[in-house]
Amino acid sequence: MMKNSTYLSICIPAFGRLEYIINTLASIYKDAEDQTIPLADFEVIVSDNDPDKELEKLKELFPYQNFKYFNTDCEGFMNSFYALTYAEGSFLKLHNSQEIFKKGSLKVLLSLVKEHMKDKNVLFFSGGLLKKGKTFTAGSFDEFIQKTSYLSSWSNAFGIWKEDFDSVKDGIDLNKLFPHTSLLFTQNNKRKYIVNDSSLFSTQFVSKRGGHNKFQAFTIEYPSILDKAVIEGDITALTKSKVIRQLMNEFLPSLFFNVKIAQRETYDYVGFKENLKRHFPKGAYCKIVLLSLFAPANIIWRKIRIKFLK
């Protein structure tokens, strides 16, 4: 084993939402206690980019040796990158502040990390959203992106080995909305890609989420990462087309419903119709609006499926 005995770093970028993060941290430490997992096996890092440092009180609430709080001077989603820079474990996993650990999840994460300490295969945690409910393997980066589709953009699924992170962190051109996805796409020459699609976490509902143009993020920024991967030969044009199709048929209708119809979320919508013309097929806007009418049924079914995944 490596000199560093910390296998796993759970890296949580955060800005406010104290009550949610308290629940998340409590679930991690409760799971460790219930499963008798030594605190030395993992560390928990909170990178707080709020200048007011509201989350600094977490140090008093969670006085564990393996808990670390940092106030970070960075903008928006770049905090996902900086959270990783503080980590000292062998494997660095990003974790969304509102995602609560289910019973036994920490053990699953640690087991996978220990299993792949030598081969350093990519480990990806899709949370049951791929409808598999089990662990499966992809033999190439193109196959991996084809199978994970737009979930390759999900920060909570992302993880990277520290030695791989250290080798790319200084020279990488990061997308400011998807820095973790930029990092993921540097891991294009691995022998295997291990996707754990178990439902390991439950999401705390955050009312009226918003704050940025999420429509632009998924019509311009994320597709541009796919474009670059096609140009550099890391994925095929066919794989990119499949991901774009699934964004159009699944993700964007759900987002449109939540923002424009149900108004459960407050993401900026400016430029959506025009932005679709750059990467999406003709008629994409009308199709998304039509499919958004079926979004409630799809959302309910997805929640039921994830809840009962074993």
Model feature map: region roles:
Residues N71-A87:
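Glycine-rich, basic loop-to-helix element that forms the pyrophosphate-binding segment
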Residues I100, G104-T137:
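Conserved donor NDP-sugar-binding/catalytic core segment of glycosyltransferases
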